[in-house]
Amino acid sequence: MHEKTIAELSAALTKGECSSVELTEHFLKRIEALDGGLNSFVTVTAEQALAQAKAADDRRARGEAGPLTGVPMAQKDIFCTDGVRTTCGSKMLDNFIAPYDATVVERFKAEGCPMLGKTNMDEFAMGSSNETSFHGPVKNPWDTARVPGGSSGGSAAAVAARLTPSATGTDTGGSIRQPAALCGITGLKPTYGRVSRWGMIAFASSLDQGGPMAATAEDCALLANVMSGFDPRDSTSIERPAEDFTARLNEPLKGLRIGLPREFFGEGLDAGVAKAVDEAIEQYKQLGAEVKEVGLPNSGLSVPAYYVVAPAECSSNLARFDGVRYGYRCENPKDLMDLYTRSRGEGFGAEVKRRIMVGTYALSAGYFDAYYLKAQKIRRLIADDFARAFEEVDVILGPTSPSTAFRLGEKTDDPVTMYLSDIYTIAVNLAGLPGMSIPAGFSDGLPVGLQLIGNYFDEARLLGVAHQYQSVTDWHRRIPKGFE
């Protein structure tokens, strides 16, 4: 059952080949048997999942099932879940039980998808390797001595190991696409404003975007249909008519114009990754696409600009965790200042503190113009680069990450090297564009991800371009050894 895609599981439920209860039990057994070596789940909600599965079966019997009713899934532990612990990977929220559901969680509940549990993640979504989590690092199912990527590393590892058919992720600078690449699955970061951020714990509000992670592009399209849509409770949510993201899956690629940014194929790109991406480009040519070089001259500034904008927003967003109303509180504070200082000092991990410090500095009176304002100007230039490129091409293609999964502990002492693992993904967030990563082969036995970037609200086309590639390759069908 776990080898099937969501589309196949949905068909099996419709034909009565299995029930949602059987499916949910199967995945819960896999989590129990196999997650010990991965640490991809923070919380497993077995009782709740089985109750939801039973309700889904009853709903199907009444003829009221939607496309995903009864197909189990997992939520990244950044989405608030009513009555279920929501930690955001931090000691600060280790005992926090959310009093409400995030919009994304509500939508999956309304569709009738049993929630298997909450997946591990980098603390407050800050990290590229899932090593900053208070719950310990997640391991990559392809090689447990290596990282799964981050911050949605738990979601990526769980989907890759087939412990869940799908999981939600969030992407602020690559946190869906980079772990999807390192774990050999498909992940979609929608256009900024497509998916409601209500109830999604904020890191950098102008960059954060939730999205689906699954084995295939078709699965991601089905999940995006559930996740996306206007939400009046999120002031950044975009009001647009509902769209069917599966509508263009079978569109032929003849005449599709693909742009290859020269900045994504230069120094720093691992040879094995470059080879796999080149082979994928050849495959696209065979499918009828036209390929040409494009320029994104300011994309090299994306990492420094991001590491001013994102920490600035995080320092503001994380000011709410002060030990007063909820979250971690230090013992026996002497006075209010001591309560603030010690609660935050003891509750936050090193990377989160680093970003709060950088962000507070960038926003301080003497430095605001030199750092924050300048970073926002660069952000505009990056968006303009993409706009010019999309006048010439329909889709931009390149590697998702400069290398395959690196070893646990290899980059933890060097933040800048760690930050550079998102060098190809960050520009997409700064511009607010949709992007996705799909499996495109292996280098030394480790998965390589291919990144596809689209114009605003062009997710349906992106998903179609990915699906056409997946219809002639089988990389998305590969399962790591020991998890078959």
Curated annotation (Swiss-Prot):
Q: Which PROSITE patterns does this entry report, sorted A to Z?
A: AMIDASES (PS00571)
Please name the InterPro entries in this protein's record.
Answer: Amidase, Amidase_CS, Amidase_dom, AS_sf, GatA
Top enzyme class, one word, equals ligase
State a single Gene Ontology molecular function: glutaminyl-tRNA synthase (glutamine-hydrolyzing) activity
Keywords, alphabetical: ATP-binding, Ligase, Nucleotide-binding, Protein biosynthesis
Q: Which reaction does it catalyse?
A: L-glutamyl-tRNA(Gln) + L-glutamine + ATP + H2O = L-glutaminyl-tRNA(Gln) + L-glutamate + ADP + phosphate + H(+)
Q: What is its EC number?
A: 6.3.5.7
Top-level taxon of the source organism:
Bacteria
Give the residues annotated as active site. 76 (charge relay system), 151 (charge relay system), 175 (acyl-ester intermediate)
Q: Subunit structure, briefly?
A: Heterotrimer of A, B and C subunits.
The job of this chain, per UniProt, is described as: Allows the formation of correctly charged Gln-tRNA(Gln) through the transamidation of misacylated Glu-tRNA(Gln) in organisms which lack glutaminyl-tRNA synthetase. The reaction takes place in the presence of glutamine and ATP through an activated gamma-phospho-Glu-tRNA(Gln).
Protein name listed in UniProt: Glutamyl-tRNA(Gln) amidotransferase subunit A
Which species is listed as the source? Thioalkalivibrio sulfidiphilus (strain HL-EbGR7)
